[in-house]
Amino acid sequence: MEKTKRTKVLFGTLAPIVGILGVAPVLLSAGCKRLPDNVKSNRFVYEYNSPYTPKEFDEDASRSYGSFLETSTWQFTHSTFLSKTGLNAANINAKKQILEPTFWKYRLELAKEVILTLKNGTTKVYDNDNAEVRPAADKSDGTYSKSSIKATSKDSKSINSEAFWNDLLNTVKMQFTIKDNIYYTNHKGEKTPYKVVARDFYYTWLRTKLITQKERIANGGTKELDELANKQLCEPSSKTFTDNDSYGNEYLYKVFNLNSSDFSDESKFITKYNGEDAVTFDAKDKNANTKSQFRNFWDKCLFSNYDWMTASSQYIDDMNEHPEKFKFYSYLNEEVSSDLKTKLGPGKTHTGKFWQTGGYWYGVSTMTTLFAGPYYAETYDATNYWRSYKKNSNYWDTEWVNADNNLKEIRMKYAKSSEIDKEQFYKNQFTFYKNGDVTSFPYSQLSDIQKAEILKDKARFGYRFIMDINEANANYIFNTQPLVKTPPKGTDLNNWFLFNDAYAKMLYGSTRQEIADGKQTLDAYVRGTGLSFRTILDAAVNWNFFEYLRKNGATKPWVAKLAEDGYVGGSEENTQTINDFYQRVNALSAYDKDGNLIKYSKNGNDFSAITPEMNADVTGTTDLEKMRSAGFDVLKQKLTELIAKFDTENPSLAGQDFTIETYFPWQNLDAKYKNALDTLATFYSQLNPRLKFKYTPYTQDKETQWKNFRYNGTAGIDFTGWGYDYNSSASGFDGLTSGVQLLQTLVSIKNANNATFDKNFPMLKKLAEAIFTYQTAHPVNSPVPFADLDKISNADSYGFLRYGFYEYTFEKNTTTGRYEMKYDADGNPIPFANATDFSEFISLFWRDYISKEKNEDIIKLTTELSTYLNVDPYNNRIGVLNEKLTPSLLNKYYKMPTIFGSTTPYRDITIDKK
């Protein structure tokens, strides 16, 4: 049983580089030669180094949720209320001066009007998206500091006006009416008789909410039919229609003070405004003193988000009314048997909201999916190995439809059989790029020889600059956990855990057998030998040099866990970002065998935190010498003392090496990154000869071990990927709370009342006290008492928040003293009645806590966590670019306006064939 708060990260073989970086590339100049066929055809082509893998609901966005993914296509084949649109491509010169940024605006997409009801009862209607005001340059030389800036409007009825933005601060109800006479398109590009209507948003909400099996069964589905649908309609390894698939984002609406239960009640969700159907979002607490959250809701939930991508209610209703007209296809676009159609297809035989919304059949295949976006999806072309997305002639924006300078087709090509060697793939791609056979190429994958070729003729190759701004992606993807998952019963521990007993005892205070038996506690990891061990190891490394090896000097280390360009978010309500405090939040401290802060002295100056600036001054003649931090010599001695103490306290393990093997979490490990990891492993053995660390790349013969590392925590490391719910450190901390079991850690800190730890980590101690105070004011109904959350068995602790185990019954094991999840006779977890939604509880806590803290205290907390939560070198966000403006390659005929935090804006791309 797996329940995640949301799908945060999706890893493809390769995503369009300009889209990933989320900023407009800028053409320096243009030459004129024979137009490539793709340019003449207004086609954008991208190629993957992997075969196409069909899956169910591949082209249907109506049962999905969360932030847009670069590797997805839904954002340009489907539509929702609103979108962001770029008005122009930026202009950045060779000196990296931004002469003109991309200006962008909010755009009424399917919405005709936005109606706001304010706290004083006033109703305001905004019926256009004019954005005629473009902000002036903010630098003294007449240039801009950012390459993407929002345009505004003086039109008081525009959603881009200052009046609208200010009104959101006092809004208690937001409604959308829908544009008239927008028709859906099928996979052949044909106009259907089905219109986009307000009710479509009700259907898409139900389709998304009913992803969760218990919700589905309560609304007409059954476990038996779920199993049938999973086996007959879905690809073999699919989680769809199982209890491992769930919708985990509803808590977010509660964080934004919305009554999400109303979304499931058609009479409350689809109301009337001036006689028209209006989709209605109502505040839960309308008290005049309650801070409105509609700005956050507007920014997070209505843009770059899949939650409200429509499903055609008219089409679904028609098929339910006339099932004889319906042809039912599996994920392979193959028609299913009449028996399966009877059991899972449309009709009036079944009742419930799941059947009403076509839960088992709508969108399973491309052929049963309808599109209201600027492009529509054709079925996969197995002859040419590509997916094609064609311009939708039925799209509501007729001016865009009739224009001849935008994209008519987006084509994604796939490998015929299996991946080829990565270096060979990029070598081929560069040739294709030069010939115009693919539209973009990641500059970071160029060899030095290829870069030299590019720089000789920048205009020909479409050389331009992009700006990398990261406001929303937390810099943690895989992290070491304080409590380790248990293996399946009867497992040979030598073939499961990727570390030995000495390592386990040092870091976790338990042997592998004790971990497997569910006896591990938090003590050693939080404030014992585990804290000393990992902080010494982290602080001993010169992460500046590690980044130099990994990225050839293009990046600087980022060991802080928060998004570097995200707002701090404190009570000052200013625009300070985490990156404004770069040296502080990326400084590392360490603690000796007794838990005391380690101090250093250099040139008469005493210090206890090693900053990147200090490490930049480290010199050496070999890579291993350069890998030493500014405190290396002291830390080496302190580690020797720690190990000596360990040997005395653990005589059966005395003299043993501390071994661990970690796998690189992704299948493609480039040579530079591998060299950096190999150098780090050798470095650790020189820090102390008993440290035997190994970083292993993925290979097919090790796939089982790699999967167990990645998904089952065999190295004590688990997936923690997280995208912000809104622009504030509060959301980044929220992700850590579930991702690295920070809630359990805070309870442990509060309960232990350890004077040494509390002195070393005063902000963590303050935080622990605060969350208990908050819980007193907002009591939780939990299967484990709040004050005992640090006593959950390590078998279930990671899943308590991450997978929603708090919805099930726990029982205290009298032998171990740990709380364990209870199961019925069939092996199913037993539900816990009226459980508090901890996702909501934690998110609300962080929102309130951070908004009341000063930025200075938030930075102190961030810095403490940089040290406390160890550095994970296989995390590819361990570094950030030295310069925000970096080179990129996009075919010189293409102009791409893009927006920070957005995916590749195919609709907004234009082609200049001159």
Predicted segments, located by residue:
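N-terminal lobe/hinge region of extracytoplasmic solute-binding protein
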Residues: 47-166, 370
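Sec-dependent signal peptide cleavage junction
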Residues: 23-41
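Gly/Pro-rich hinge or "lid" segments in bacterial periplasmic/extracellular proteins
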Residues: 297-423, 427
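Surface-exposed binding/hinge segments that line
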Residues: 171, 175-180, 194, 199-203, ...
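Aromatic- and charge-enriched surface segment that lines or borders ligand/interaction sites
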Residues: 110-224, 229, 524-529, 533-534
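Extracytoplasmic/periplasmic ligand-capture domains
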Residues: 181-190, 195-213, 374-550, 571-869, ...
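Membrane-penetrating hydrophobic segments
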Residues: 2-18
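Short, glycine/acidic-rich hinge or "gate" loops at secondary-structure transitions
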Residues: 217-227, 549-569
